[in-house]
């Protein structure tokens, strides 16, 4: 993979170079010392992935991510001194289009095979699989849907998701009568913090989905592990390692397919901004079962990958700008409740 480094600290750049050199198939394409340079380099010499620091002079990592995604979209991995100390900026960068985040390896660890360089390499490998993926979704068997459970809104998001989710959730009323379950492509290390972060922007309670959780009307559950979230035929949430070959964990396709075959009430599917194709086939499975499905439009998507794939295969009942998705959900659920 051709990799661009954006970091103003020489020691950090050297540490990243040494970690990248551990893999023969990776090479450093260029190094930028601030966000402005990074944007110019991405336009002139597009990399496969950018390793983006957060704190830099002139233009910081969040602003640089936003500008790159507007001018020369590519995969961006936030690599910063301490992810845990910069969670707000990390979520903001992910909302702008970054795919994931990891701590910067130290120079000493960069010479070894300790966890720090391996964590970075694992993230790069994961992004590589996503870029190469032509994922096919597996539809688990389940009984024919019947009535008896509340309306469920199943939402999938990836790059740009945190900002899109914030906008969608804050537009829903406190008495929203449906259950909401979200699968956002995010490492489990950030899931609890993201649930708390989203909880601060909505009138609905946002919690992580645990093994055995049950979707409830007026509440939001967020997938919280690196395994796949699924609904059982009894409407109970759980996690599974299978299928193992999916490029992103948790997989939106796996969850949407389980909703299509396992949820016994009415359901709506929403596929938001994101890179790749995850969620498109699952959304189509939901639509085939009679669910109303929505894909975010190109103009309001930070990364028009997943919703584009859904639109291309006819998976979406409607393709909407972000600010129209919440009103449409409210209207559709009101219509369903009158039936």
From Swiss-Prot:
Protein's GO biological process: chemotaxis
Enzyme Commission number: 3.1.1.61, 3.5.1.44
Record Pfam families: CheB_methylest, Response_reg
SUPFAM superfamilies: CheY-like, Methylesterase CheB, C-terminal domain
Modification(s) after translation: Phosphorylated by CheA. Phosphorylation of the N-terminal regulatory domain activates the methylesterase activity.
CDD domains: CheB_Rec, REC_CheB-like
CheB-type methylesterase domain residues: 141-336
Response regulatory domain ranges (all copies): 2-119
Transmembrane segments: none
Catalytic activity: [protein]-L-glutamate 5-O-methyl ester + H2O = L-glutamyl-[protein] + methanol + H(+); L-glutaminyl-[protein] + H2O = L-glutamyl-[protein] + NH4(+)
Keywords, in A-Z order: Chemotaxis, Cytoplasm, Hydrolase, Phosphoprotein
Biological role stated in the UniProt entry: Involved in chemotaxis. Part of a chemotaxis signal transduction system that modulates chemotaxis in response to various stimuli. Catalyzes the demethylation of specific methylglutamate residues introduced into the chemoreceptors (methyl-accepting chemotaxis proteins or MCP) by CheR. Also mediates the irreversible deamidation of specific glutamine residues to glutamic acid.
Protein name in UniProt: Protein-glutamate methylesterase/protein-glutamine glutaminase 3
Name of the coding gene: cheB3
């Amino acid at each position: 993979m051709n990799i661009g480094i954006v970091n103003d600290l020489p020691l950090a750049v050297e540490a990243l170079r040494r970690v990248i050199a551990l893999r023969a198939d990776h090479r450093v394409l260029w190094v930028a010392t601030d966000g402005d340079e990074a944007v110019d380099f991405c336009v002139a010499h597009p990399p496969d992935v950018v390793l983006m620091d957060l704190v830099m002079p002139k233009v910081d990592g969040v602003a640089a991510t936003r500008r790159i995604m507007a001018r020369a979209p590519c995969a961006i991995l936030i690599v910063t001194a301490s992810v845990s100390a910069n969670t707000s900026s990390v979520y903001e960068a992910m909302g702008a289009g970054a795919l994931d985040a990891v701590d910067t390896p130290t120079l000493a660890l960069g010479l070894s095979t300790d966890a720090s360089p391996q964590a970075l390499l694992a993230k790069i490998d994961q992004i590589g699989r996503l870029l190469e993926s032509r994922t096919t979704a597996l539809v688990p068997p389940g009984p024919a849907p019947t009535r008896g459970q509340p309306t469920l809104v199943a939402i999938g998001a990836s790059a740009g998701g945190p900002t899109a989710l914030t906008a969608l959730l804050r537009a829903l009323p406190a008495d929203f009568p449906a259950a909401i379950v979200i699968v956002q492509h995010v490492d489990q290390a950030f899931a609890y913090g993201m649930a708390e972060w989203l909880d601060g922007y909505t009138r609905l309670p946002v919690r992580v989905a645990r093994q055995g959780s049950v979707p409830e009307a007026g509440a939001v559950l967020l997938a919280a592990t690196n395994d796949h979230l699924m609904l059982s035929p009894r409407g109970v949430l759980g996690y599974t390692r299978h299928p193992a070959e999916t490029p992103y964990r948790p997989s939106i396709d796996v969850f949407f397919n389980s909703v299509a075959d396992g949820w016994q009430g009415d359901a709506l599917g929403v596929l938001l901004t994101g890179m790749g194709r995850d969620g498109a086939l699952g959304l189509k499975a939901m639509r085939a079962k009679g669910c109303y499905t929505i894909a975010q439009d190109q103009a309001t998507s930070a990364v028009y990958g997943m919703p584009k794939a859904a639109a291309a295969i006819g998976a979406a009942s409607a393709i909407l700008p972000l600010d129209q998705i919440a009103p449409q959900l409210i209207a559709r659920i009101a219509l369903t409740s009158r039936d």
